[in-house]
Amino acid sequence: MGTTLAEKVWADHLVRKGSDGAPDLLYIDLMLMHEVTSPQAFEGLRLAGRKPRHVDQLIATEDHNTPTVDIDRPNPDETSALQLTTLEKNCKEFGVRLHPLGDADQGIVHAFAPILGLTQPGMTIVCGDSHTSTHGAFGALAFGIGTSEVEHVMATQTLSLKPFKTMAVNVNGKLPADATAKDIILAIIAKIGTGGGQGYVIEYRGEAIRNLTMDERMTVCNMSIEAGARAGMIAPDETTFEYLKGRPHAPEGELWDQAVAYWKTLKTDDDAVFDKVVDIDATKLGPYVTWGTNPGQGLPITASVPEPGKIADATKRAAAERAITYMGLKPGMPIKDIAVDTVFIGSCTNGRIDDLRQAAAIMKGHRKAENIHRVLVVPASSRVRLQAEKEGLDKVFKDFGAEWRNAGCSMCLGMNPDKLVPNERSISTSNRNFEGRQGKGSRTHLASPAVAAATAIRGTISSPADL
C-alpha cells in the first residue's frame, strides 16, 4: 500500500520509531519564533545551562505585539514592550537570528519565512503559534507547538510525537470567478466544523487547489487549525518551484536541481489510503462570510443569519443563539444587510501581495463608505509592504481613505494597539472571529480581501458583484 504526502515527510524525519504505543522521535528542520511564546523557552534553557542544538535552524521575528504606526516610538503598552525587549535580549544571548521591528525582513512569522525561501517542500517546521500550518502550502509538515515543546526543540532539534491521522479534502472542479482561496477554506470549515479535522493532517487536493497561487495556497493551509487539524498540506508542483526559485534561502545551481528532484517525489501515492476523505464541489462556491463567533459559522454571502428555532441539534441551537446575541444580529436577516464599522485587510491569512492586489483592484476609483469608521490595510511583512509600494498599491489605499500601515499581526488579535471597541463590528480578512478576538466586545466577520474591499465601499457586507 502506498503512502500519503504527510506520511512520506514524517518517515523522512523519523529519528526513532516509538514502541508499545510510545511516541516517535521526529527531527525538526526549522523552528520559527516570536515574542509571545518564546520567553519561557529561553528561560528554561538558561536555567538548565543549555545552548540551542542547532541555532542556525532557529529564526525569530517580532509580530504579535508590534505597533503598525509610529514604530520608531516607544511601545505604549508596557507588557508588549517587555515581551519585545525580552525577545531581543534572548536572541542576542543565545545567538538566534532575529528580524526585529524596523528590519527589512520583519513581518508576521508565517509571512516572512516563505518570502525568504526558508520554507521549503518536505521540511518539518514548528513554531509556538497555531497558524504554523501556513507553511504546509509548500508540502512541508508544519504545525504549532506549546512553549515547553519550543524549549525541547531548541535543546534537541527533535520532538516526541505520535503520528497524525490523514485526511484528504478534494476541492473538485474550477473555482468560479467570484470565489477565492478564503472562500474555499471557509466553506470547508463550515462543512466539517471546527472539530472536523481534530487529530488529522489535512491534504488539500483537486483542480481548484492546483490552480491557486502560492499566496492563495497559504491562505487555505493557514486556516487548517480552524478546522481543528494539526496541519494542512498541499503537494509541491511547478507553481511551488517557480515561487521558490531565486529566493534568498533557496538552493542554487546543482543543489537546486537536486532539491527539485526530491520535491517532485513528495506526492501521495495513487494507492495510498487516507483515514478520512471529504469532497467539495468548487464549481458551486462563491463568496463566504462568517456570521457567528467561530470560523465554522460561515455561510454564502447571499444567505441569511440562521434561525436557531430551525436547528434540530440542541447544542448547535444554543451556540447559534449565543452567537447571534453576542454579534447583535437578528435571526433571518440577510447577511448583506449587516452594516460594518471597521474593515481590516491583513494578517498571516490574507496580508500577502496577492491579497493586497485583490483589494486594491476593487477599491481603485472608489472612496470608503461614510459609515465605515476606518479601513486598515496591514501588509504581512516588510517585503510585502515594499512590493506593494513599488506597484503603487499604497496610493490606491490612501486615495480610498484607508490607513496604510507597517507590517505586523495588527487587528487579527487584541494584543497590540490595533483593536476594536466594545460592540464595534468589523469585516476582517484574518482567521478567527471568537468573542473578544479583536478587542473586548468586538464583533468580527471573516471574509476574503475581495469581500472586505467591497464592504468598505458599500458600508454593508457586500461582494464585488454588488458594486
UniProtKB/Swiss-Prot annotation:
GO terms for biological process: L-leucine biosynthetic process. Transmembrane segments: none annotated. It comes from the Bacteria. Keywords: 4Fe-4S, Amino-acid biosynthesis, Branched-chain amino acid biosynthesis, Iron, Iron-sulfur, Leucine biosynthesis, Lyase, Metal-binding. Its cofactor is [4Fe-4S] cluster. Pathway: Amino-acid biosynthesis; L-leucine biosynthesis; L-leucine from 3-methyl-2-oxobutanoate: step 2/4. Its EC number is 4.2.1.33. InterPro entries: 3-IsopropMal_deHydase_lsu, Acnase/IPM_dHydase_lsu_aba_1/3, Acoase/IPM_deHydtase_lsu_aba, Aconitase_4Fe-4S_BS, Aconitase_4Fe-4S_dom, IPM_dehydratase_rel_enz, IPMI_cat. It is an enzyme of class 4 (lyase). Binds 1 [4Fe-4S] cluster per subunit. [4Fe-4S] cluster binds at C348, C409, C412. PROSITE patterns: ACONITASE_1, ACONITASE_2. GO terms for molecular function: 3-isopropylmalate dehydratase activity; 4 iron, 4 sulfur cluster binding; metal ion binding. SUPFAM superfamilies: Aconitase iron-sulfur domain. It catalyses: (2R,3S)-3-isopropylmalate = (2S)-2-isopropylmalate. Catalyzes the isomerization between 2-isopropylmalate and 3-isopropylmalate, via the formation of 2-isopropylmaleate. Belongs to the aconitase/IPM isomerase family. LeuC type 1 subfamily. Heterodimer of LeuC and LeuD. This is 3-isopropylmalate dehydratase large subunit. It comes from Bifidobacterium longum (strain NCC 2705). The gene is leuC.
